[in-house]
């Protein structure tokens, strides 16, 4: 992505939301924002550095990935004398930012690369002024007396955020320059600003999705290459021999994770947006399964068997018996649910694909039926997306499609409306259809639901007329884990990720449901789980899918079987 990260644009958006949130008596004052970036992380009780990932709010306002940096933002309300060397927002406020980065420490340069110089940062960052981090305290305490009546805003001083240095807060208190810093408004203002993405941000998310889409395809192709060359038979390579990338096979969840991450890294992505979920067979029924430590189930095994078992520590089971003699083991029919996405310049992707493993690289009849139903849920949801549509309505439609699909498969029985009202579908589809995505994979939680309001009762960012659909009141379990509860607005970026799961934990409370044909259900439980997830941006007239990897059954099977 070319060009300088538009930090001033993001500061202006945040300041506009901040002034909207403030009580009337505070809006006439100058507002001062103090933020600190992430510090260099270390492994516990050692001097070994860990990978740095900048705190999202700090990066949003600075575009700075340098550890131990700080930010001072001053905003003067409309109608007041503008600040020197400042930017004027669309509402008439003047804003000025100073980015502080650490000096080079000659003693540290032997061990680690030095931070950029001020001259280098001036060419690559969108701040009004630059200074060194060791000047942060003096700059803050010298600036405030010049501003008159001012309110200082900081993020909550909790472990969730890098805290502003205590020396700054102490010096402010000693000097008696202002009332104590306020933590009420800055985070909601940031979340509201981040909810609607700029074209620059959307391009970063598009690139993250392109890289992750190719990595998902790599997984399918490696599985297919293995299926074509050795027919899914047990690997006989020696554990102590080097294996080149072109010889890699995927027989374990960890191997799939390794190939996915390697594919992203070789394309320049530094971080995964979240811990990959690599779940085979029944493990796919656990929504956030991040263990990724099991081998795939092995046979020989008939596709109709429901007792796919994997020893967690020993890996493969190589004792298949057929026709009274030892038979060469092959991969058992199962699915691999891979929910993984990388970041590009700290902006996330979030993609899930469910791929057949074993069975010649093709879905069993039961897995295919469930996959096609989930795909129908997702396609209908995507087709409905447009500004003004309430996200609750998308969630409800997914449940309706599931109910009708289960009736056709014979898993459900009875009247569709009665089944929907019973909320039994929540046992199979317990989570929300999607969430906001941006600098964080579960982005801006405080702005994704309608609770945060201004002092006058106006909903953040989206106006006063947002209401929850009446239908939502009648199906509370459908929305319990829905992370977005708003009408859609152009510029929102969100995931669409319905799924169907056969989790013993979730099914236990509905085992006696009169709406379930338990004999039919038993035939599908070995599927484990299926989820399909894409990232979309809401446009003026609909949506654009930023995820490019295929998801049609025929396309996936062609890759996973080695046909192409």
Give the location of each predicted region.
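Active-site neighborhoods and metal-handling regions in enzymes and metal-associated proteins
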Residues: 1-564
């Amino acid at each position: 992505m070319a060009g300088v990260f538009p930090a001033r644009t993001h500061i202006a958006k945040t300041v506009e939301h901040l002034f909207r949130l403030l009580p009337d008596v505070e809006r006439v004052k100058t507002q001062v924002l103090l933020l600190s970036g992430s510090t260099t992380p270390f492994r516990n009780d050692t001097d070994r550095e860990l990978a740095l990932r900048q705190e999202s709010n700090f990066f949003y306002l600075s575009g700075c990935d340098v550890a131990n940096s700080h930010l001072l933002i001053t905003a003067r309300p409309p109608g007041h004398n503008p600040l020197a060397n400042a930017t004027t927002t669309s509402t008439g406020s003047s804003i000025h930012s100073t980015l502080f980065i650490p000096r080079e420490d000659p003693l540290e340069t032997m061990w680690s690369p030095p931070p950029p110089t001020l001259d280098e940062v001036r060419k690559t960052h969108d701040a009004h002024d630059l200074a060194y981090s060791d000047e942060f305290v003096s700059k803050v305490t010298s600036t405030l007396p010049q501003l008159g009546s001012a309110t200082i805003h900081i993020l909550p001083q909790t472990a969730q955020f890098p805290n502003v240095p205590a020396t700054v807060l102490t010096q402010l208190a000693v000097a008696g320059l202002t009332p104590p810093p306020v933590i009420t408004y800055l985070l909601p203002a940031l979340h509201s600003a981040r909810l609607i993405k700029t074209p620059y941000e959307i391009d970063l998310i598009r690139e993250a999705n392109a890289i992750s889409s190719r990595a998902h395809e790599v997984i399918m192709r490696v599985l297919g290459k293995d299926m074509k060359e050795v027919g899914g038979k047990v690997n006989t390579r020696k554990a102590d021999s080097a294996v080149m990338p072109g010889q890699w096979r995927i027989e374990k969840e960890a191997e799939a994770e390794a190939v996915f991450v390697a594919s992203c890294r070789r394309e320049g992505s530094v971080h995964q947006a979240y811990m990959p979920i690599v779940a085979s067979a029944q493990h796919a029924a656990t929504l956030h399964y991040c263990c990724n430590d099991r081998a795939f189930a092995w046979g020989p095994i008939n596709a109709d068997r429901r007792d796919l078992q994997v020893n967690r520590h020993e890996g493969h089971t190589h004792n298949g018996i057929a026709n009274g003699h030892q038979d060469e083991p092959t991969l058992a029919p199962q699915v691999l649910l891979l929910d993984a996405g990388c970041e590009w310049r700290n902006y996330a992707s979030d993609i899930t694909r469910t791929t057949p493993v074993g069975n010649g690289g093709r879905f069993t009849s039961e897995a295919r039926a469930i996959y096609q139903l989930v795909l129908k849920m997702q396609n209908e949801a995507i087709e409905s997306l447009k500004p003004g549509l309430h996200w609750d309505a998308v969630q409800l439609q997914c449940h309706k499609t599931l109910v009708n699909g289960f009736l056709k498969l014979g898993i459900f029985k009875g009247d569709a409306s009665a089944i929907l009202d019973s909320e039994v579908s929540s046992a199979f589809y317990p989570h929300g259809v999607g969430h906001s995505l941006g600098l964080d994979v579960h982005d801006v939680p405080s702005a994704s639901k309608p609770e945060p309001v201004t002092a006058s009762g106006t909903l953040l960012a989206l106006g006063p007329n947002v209401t929850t659909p009446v239908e939502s009141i009648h199906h509370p379990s459908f929305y319990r884990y829905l992370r977005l509860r708003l009408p859609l607005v152009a510029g929102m970026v969100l995931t669409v990720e319905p799924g169907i799961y056969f989790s013993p934990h979730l099914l236990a409370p509905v085992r006696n449901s009169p709406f379930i044909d338990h004999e039919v259900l038993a035939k599908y439980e070995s599927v484990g789980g299926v989820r399909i997830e894409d990232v979309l941006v809401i446009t003026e007239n609909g949506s654009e899918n930023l995820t490019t990897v295929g998801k049609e059954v025929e396309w996936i099977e062609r890759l996973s079987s080695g046909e192409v």
